[in-house]
Amino acid sequence: MNEDLKVNLSGLPRDYLDAAAAENISAAVSSRVPAVEPEPELVVNPWDIVLCTSGTLISCENAIVVLIIFHNPSLRAPMFLLIGSLALADLLAGIGLITNFVFAYLLQSEATKLVTIGLIVASFSASVCSLLAITVDRYLSLYYALTYHSERTVTFTYVMLVMLWGTSICLGLLPVMGWNCLRDESTCSVVRPLTKNNAAILSVSFLFMFALMLQLYIQICKIVMRHAHQIALQHHFLATSHYVTTRKGVSTLAIILGTFAACWMPFTLYSLIADYTYPSIYTYATLLPATYNSIINPVIYAFRNQEIQKALCLICCGCIPSSLAQRARSPSDV
């Protein structure tokens, strides 16, 4: 039959029918082809960026201290061993914060979560324990001033280092070995995957160590005041000079202890009273100051030390400034 004789029973224009047929064919074809869903955009929490930045600063600062102490054979006294332990712990803490950011957004898995939280717990525990060990060492160096540099003191320092790192590693292994809340979210603390009980143990341990440090620093203040008074009498210093020296020593100790408490106390108390149901912004707001303590530690304990300052100057410019070479240690340098 001739095409011109075909009857259009629908009464619609032929162009419209051709277009409708094309749309039907296109719809049928597209229904057989699976739709490609767009990949979800990676949304990064600004708090995680701040924590990662903090971890980077921590790592850079403390890496310098570790390298100075490791490469300088003269820095092998008990005090420098403990400062090196503190710097190494803070260095690992900074690395833990960086790896936590990388694994959270690039390599998400249960294994990476457990390894990262284990590293962070172990390193921060070692950092706090090293601060306590430094406080003990300072107390012993003042209380047993005549016998402090004996072989017995070096042995005691190594025993403290083994104990504090052994305890810290054990605390870090607890989440990895199974004490976590990955299978039961109701037991989670403010920091997943730590359990509420695990966080409580860490918080109570911190409060106990803080109480010990407070007691030791009170005793150190008494010894410093007594030594400063004796030096003033021997050298016929004025009373105002004795007062200024004592005040500097007490102020230094107050700054050290106050900084430590201000950094760690908010997160410690929050971990005791809160759980996983609380908004995460509170966890970030209290955890971030705790990381600042690892940024401040090298300034307080390492870069203020004369010997480390000399070693750093030798590395950077190959000479020791006359102000460092001639500076005498005073009772306020505690």
Swiss-Prot record:
PTM annotation (Phosphoserine): residues: S330, S332
Keyword Cell wall biogenesis/degradation: no
Transmembrane regions: 49-69, 78-98, 114-134, 159-179, 200-220, 253-273, 283-303
Gene3D superfamilies: Rhodopsin 7-helix transmembrane proteins
GO MF entry, a single one: G protein-coupled receptor activity
Cytoplasmic face residues: 70-77, 135-158, 221-252, 304-334
Membrane topology: Multi-pass membrane protein
Biological processes, Gene Ontology terms: adenylate cyclase-activating G protein-coupled receptor signaling pathway; G protein-coupled receptor signaling pathway; intracellular calcium ion homeostasis; regulation of metabolic process
Keywords from the named record: Cell membrane, G-protein coupled receptor, Glycoprotein, Lipoprotein, Membrane, Palmitate, Phosphoprotein, Receptor, Transducer, Transmembrane, Transmembrane helix
Subcellular location: Cell membrane
Pfam families documented for this protein: 7tm_1
Annotated Gene Ontology cellular component terms: cytoplasm; plasma membrane
Family, as annotated: Belongs to the G-protein coupled receptor 1 family.
PANTHER family: G-PROTEIN COUPLED RECEPTOR
Role, per record: Promotes neurite outgrowth and blocks myelin inhibition in neurons. Receptor with constitutive G(s) signaling activity that stimulates cyclic AMP production.
Name the record gives this protein: G-protein coupled receptor 12
UniProt lineage: Eukaryota, Metazoa, Chordata, Craniata, Vertebrata
